[in-house]
Structures are given as structure tokens and as C-alpha cells.
Amino acid sequence: MEKIKLIECPRDAMQGWKTFIPTEIKIEYINKLLEVGFDTIDFGSFVSPKAIPQLADTKEVLNGLNLAHTNSKLLAIVANVRGAEEAVQYNEISYLGFPFSISETFQRLNTNSSIEDSLKTIDAIQHLCVRHNKQLVTYMSMGFGNPYGDAYNSDIAIHWVEKLSQLGNTIFSMSDTVGVSNPDTITYIFSNLVKAFPSLEFGAHFHSTQETAMEKITAAYDNK
């Protein structure tokens, strides 16, 4: 029987808000999401508060979540080994997510490191996850293109999945960071990824509009 996992991502929705969302409101909202039945909730981030002030209260939010009566798992984003070392100490967290950008420019803007350095970081985080019984989810940022003029085509995205899988990564979320994907590029990437790497798990993380959301979801679903 085929299984599709739904991952809800309040962390991504919240992190760009300029006005700080009170911790108790975050807790209340995420607790409601935990009642829905999502496979996983991407709820917070173990990164520097200077980088993402909105998520500086991730530990407080975690302490306020009601996990006793839910099957939903928790995912937290990390951007370096220090953050991963902190996140793996929490038994409540099942997944660590790392944003790996296919765009060199965005990788430096987002994590203050090059793609080459990020490969070393991912390798270290993967070893941490194995030791602490966590799973690493690699968010393939700018997975469908970028606005910086950095080289991109679908085969470049597939190349980086292959490279990262050699480090032991098994879960990849192909992320349309700036909303440039379309059904054709989605179909090409997922049909080729699933064929080339049948043992890996692939997810689709789209930024879209109401008008184009369903056609993107359908393209990914039809090529699962």
C-alpha cells in the first residue's frame, strides 16, 4: 500500500514575520496542528536568534507542546553542527532538517557557508543523527531554480541528491524556495529522482499561489 506523508510547516510560515509572535500563541497553534494527524510538524529551529529572531523561543515552544496523544512527529531546522548538537538532545524531536541550497549564493546567504563547506556540515550532522536515533531531512533549497543567476537545471538538482545520498542521507525535500517551479519541471525532477533512487524518500515543498498550488501538487503526486 502506497503511503503519502503530509508534513505541516508552521516554522516556515512564522520565521519571516517581523512582529514577534507570542510564545503562548505558537504553542496553542502547534498543539492544534498536532491534533490533525499530520505525519510530521516542522515546528522550530535551533539556529542563532540573531539569524531568526522569531524562532528564538523554540525550546520554550517545545516544552509547551502536548505530545501525549498524538502520532505526529517533530522536525526542527538546524544550520550548523552546534545547532544539531543541541537539537539531538531532545527526545521529542524525531527529525533534523538542514537547508542545503543548490544555489551557491543562497547557501551563503542562508547558512553563511559555501556548498562545499555545507557538505562537510551535513556529513557531521548525519553522524550525530545516527548516534542519537534521529533522521536527517535535507531540504534541497532553490531546488527548482534561483533568482541570482547561479547555474541551474534539473540535472544539477539530481546530481546533488546523488552526492548527498552517498553521505548517508535518505530523505530529501525538494524545495521551491522562490516559487518558480511549474508542472513540467516538477514532473521531470520527481520522475527521474524516483527512478534513479528508489530507496530514497522524496518530498515536495512548494511556495505557490492559490491559482497554481494544485497543479504543482498534482504533478508531484503523479510522479511519486
Which residues make up each language-model segment?
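Catalytic alpha/beta core domains of metabolic enzymes, predominantly
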Residues: 177-223
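Glycine-rich, positively charged N-terminal anion/phosphate-binding segment
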Residues: 23-24, 28-32, 36-69, 78-86, ...
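Glycine-rich, proline-tolerant flexible connector loops at the mouths of alpha/beta enzymes
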Residues: 39-64, 98-113, 142-148, 173-184
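Glycine-enriched alpha-helix->loop->beta-strand junction motifs that scaffold or abut catalytic
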Residues: 37, 89-96, 166-170, 192-201, ...
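N-terminal small/glycine-rich loop or linker at the start of catalytic domains
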Residues: 1-18, 98-110, 131-148, 193, ...
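Conserved anion-binding
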Residues: 103-170, 175-177
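Hydrophobic faces of well-ordered beta-strands that scaffold small-molecule active sites
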Residues: 4-12, 39-43, 72-78, 94-98, ...
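Alpha-helix-loop-beta-strand connector modules within alpha/beta enzyme cores
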Residues: 51-76, 116-138, 186-204
